[in-house]
Amino acid sequence: MKGLYIKTYGCQMNVYDSILMENIVKPLGFNVVSDAEQADLVILNTCHIREKAAEKLYSELGRIHSSQKNKEMTIVVAGCVAQAEGEEVFRRAPFVDIVVGPQSIPALPELIVKASRSKGHVINTDFPEVAKFDKLPDECYGNSQGSSAFLAIQEGCDKFCTFCVVPYTRGAEYSRPVNEIFREALNLVKNGAKEITLLGQNVNAYHGECEGEVWDLGKLISHIAKIEKLERIRYTTSHPRDMHESLYLVHAEESKLMPFVHLPVQSGSNKILHAMNRKHTAEEYLGIIDRLRKLKPEIEFSSDFIVGFPGETEKDFEETMKLVEKVKYAQAYSFKYSPRPGTPGAERKDQVPEEVKTERLLRLQELISKQQLEFNQSMIGKTIPVLFSDKKGKHQNQIIGKSPYMQSVCVDDPDDKYKDKIVNVRILEARQNSLLGCAA
């Protein structure tokens, strides 16, 4: 067997795509290895959402090339950098053999064969008329991912936020048919999944076909929840514009749906939200939060924030801080604005100085960290259900699981009893990024 090494950068959709690529090349005689030096085929599945994420690719390529012992190794750059930069990847890293975009994954086996025969550069960054999900063989879907699994139900974006490359790298919004998703969910559960996270760039924009009808995300979740041995359902990433009635109601009514929503807002300033083309206001966003909390009092939230978008003033930034204070997030992710080539935001003349972005980011992260620690501390003394996988902790006999709120929970498991199980855990101690407890 030949060695396959895959390194994944970025979002959960990339993790899912890497699983698809692994499954689609295995029939060519590849088995996964843990080190690029042992590999005959190296795939770097990339992220282009920020400049730093893209530059990680070229750093890793340089490292692999400098330590390359196998002269027959095939190097593939996949994902959003591949889609956005195309031939530029070959210019910056001429030793790369294949560049393949996210929508061209079904062509990967053919590209590998072509590259081995031609010994030249091979590229496919097409947006085919037939969605990639419809072109991949059935055996690519539903294989074991352990006790927690990803399932892509929607891909692409029609929102065209002015800071974002996703519409250009992932294409227009596409929703997979209901029956196809349900079949994959059944297979995942059959192969050990107790939790499924439904994925999409705008997952709550889902509008999949089922026997002549169009289903939204709320209806899909209710349907998937009928799978008997499935115990937890999550979804990510959602957009405030796509919240709809059945999604609100399924949060209130379906116990398998976790009480945790990742709902990116990006800014608390209406002026900046308008400049970002978000097409919602801070007040509308807060209204969504309030309604979900009324329907499901134990629900908690995470979000994404961009600091220093062009034109952001101190007043605009303070409005973001006020929104964070109002919501009180369980966790949140924050980044300095990174101009992406080809996006309207990158063309603006009123870019915020780097030192101002850095200072604001530190202030925001301090507030977010404070809220996260307070939320974690609020769990002390409570007993919560924790899903464990095979992830080990820093200490001997320690295993790590996930709370309903995506917190890492560490417990001692000397007899290896908790792997792939949901266990009630009493929380004894809270840290910034984790909880410590014991089986109740």
From Swiss-Prot:
Binding-site residues, [4Fe-4S] cluster 1: C11, C47, C80
* Gene3D superfamilies the UniProt entry points to: Methylthiotransferase, N-terminal domain, tm_1862 like domain
Return the SUPFAM superfamilies for the record: Radical SAM enzymes
What Pfam families does the entry give?
A: Radical_SAM, TRAM, UPF0004
Q: Establish whether keyword 4Fe-4S is in the entry.
A: yes
Cofactor details (free text): Binds 2 [4Fe-4S] clusters. One cluster is coordinated with 3 cysteines and an exchangeable S-adenosyl-L-methionine.
Q: Where does [4Fe-4S] cluster 2 bind?
A: C157, C161, C164
Which cofactor is recorded for it? [4Fe-4S] cluster
Disulfide cross-links: none
Tell me which InterPro entries the record gives.
Answer: Elp3/MiaA/NifB-like_rSAM, Methylthiotransferase, Methylthiotransferase_CS, Methylthiotransferase_N, Methylthiotransferase_N_sf, MiaB_methiolase, rSAM, rSAM_horseshoe
Span of domain MTTase N-terminal: 2-117
HAMAP family from the xrefs?
tRNA_metthiotr_MiaB (MF_01864)
**Assembly and partners?**
Monomer.
What the record says about family reads: Belongs to the methylthiotransferase family. MiaB subfamily.
Q: What is this protein called?
A: tRNA-2-methylthio-N(6)-dimethylallyladenosine synthase
Q: Which organism is it from?
A: Wolbachia pipientis subsp. Culex pipiens (strain wPip)
What is the gene name? miaB
